Amino acid sequence: MKVNDRVTVKTDGGPRRPGVVLAVEEFSEGTMYLVALEDYPLGIWFFNEAGHQDGIFVEKAE
């Protein structure tokens, strides 16, 4: 995924929420995405852990 992609994010106890990627940072353990959500327009960071399906919080929207 890259900047300006439409995504959905997994949050605690609720349905996936739509957002837009503002920034991407790659790490050896995975990737951090700064995602603008409706109630966080300046963005909030989410981490996708490499190699662990349970550690995937950001997915590209269809």
Swiss-Prot record:
InterPro entries: Dextransucrase_DSRB. It comes from the Bacteria. It holds the Pfam family DSRB. Belongs to the DsrB family. NCBIfam families: PRK10708.1 (NF007981). This is Protein DsrB. It comes from Shigella flexneri. The lineage of its organism: Bacteria, Pseudomonadati, Pseudomonadota, Gammaproteobacteria, Enterobacterales. The gene is dsrB.
